[in-house]
Amino acid sequence: MAQSAEMLWIDALELDQAGDIQEALELARHIVEIDSRHSDAWMMIARLSLPPLNRGKQVMPTLAQAATSLSALRRVVQHDHDNKEAWILGGALLVDHLGMMEESLVWWEQRRDVEPREVMPLIEQIGVLIRLGIYKDAGERLEEMFSDEMEPPDNKELMGMDKVRSLVENAAKMEKDDVFRPANHKHKRWAVIDRMKTRKPVSPTLFLFTFVAPIVFLLGTVAMTLVGGSLFGFVLVFFIILGLFMVVSKFATSLLHKLNRHALDLDRALDVEMSTGKVCIPDDIRGSKLYNAMLGQRPPAFAERLEKIAEVGERLSYRWKPDLPNWMVMADADYEDEIDESEEDGPLELDGIED
């Protein structure tokens, strides 16, 4: 007599707890064949399709593993809208591993249909909008996130809210008059990237030790000389140095972003290629030291999918605009206005770029 899905599910849980991952995975797949609405079994498939921990560290999934897990997660949220873990894992796979930026915006908008007062979807959407350079709408979502209508965030969400607020402010300042649109091969930022393609981005750690630390050390030495002759003075100098470090670090972060502007621009181009499945990066930049350095910071699945996109080589139209949810209709208009303005500029000659 055939066992029911629930009886098999108990067996699958026991196998999972015993560490027999492959057997548990096969049984979970059998369960969803019997009951396609078994969200717990779909969640087990999604989780066990990803690599297990190795010595306490998470192993990055391959492209096939990430895609399989995401497919199962779509079934989880379809049948269990309240499974927050599935929404979070799916969002991470879409952005970090598969590079599907536009899909991730839709994913989190669907989560908002379930929990409209939750701040987490807005945090994730703002992060993606910043990466695509859509600052106006990122700012609008930021205002909504801090409105009284949203539910009180937990500590982790508070940190995320503060982070995206800083990202919006810094990015808007850096690209105030010149938002980089990778699809436009005539954009002047491509010429800058081409000139800087043989240079790796400045490491934050290196910048900390070569710029921030010496300044704080010198100022701290001066403060110690002036007021450090007593216990009270020593304590005062400690807090002075701590304050100086925070102030100088904040200033240095903005400076570091300006120094690495070419790398951040190329990073956006990588995101656009991954999101569209089409190429916009010139051949003479692809494979350069800068390109390899930026790609090396991405997970293996991201690099694997990008390589496949580059092999196909379908060119991204310069009139491309993001395919975004309905709440982003105004963003489409903004993109069209910027494209029209760029067409009025004279052609930019840059070796390696073809129409």
Locate predicted features.
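Alpha-helical segment of the N-proximal tetratricopeptide repeat
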Residues: 2-34, 44, 50-61
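Charged, low-complexity cytosol-facing tails and large interhelical loops of integral membrane proteins
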Residues: 4-11, 35, 269-355
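Structural signature of tandem alpha-helical TPR/SEL1-like repeats
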Residues: 18-26, 53-72, 98-110, 133-141
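Short coil turns that delineate tetratricopeptide repeat
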Residues: 36, 81-82, 116, 150-153
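TPR alpha-solenoid repeat register
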Residues: 41, 86, 121, 154-155
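Canonical tetratricopeptide repeat
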Residues: 44, 89-90, 124
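TPR/TPR-like (Sel1-like) alpha-helical repeat modules
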Residues: 62-71, 111-114, 127-154, 166, ...
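Transmembrane alpha-helical hairpins and terminal membrane-anchor modules
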Residues: 198-272
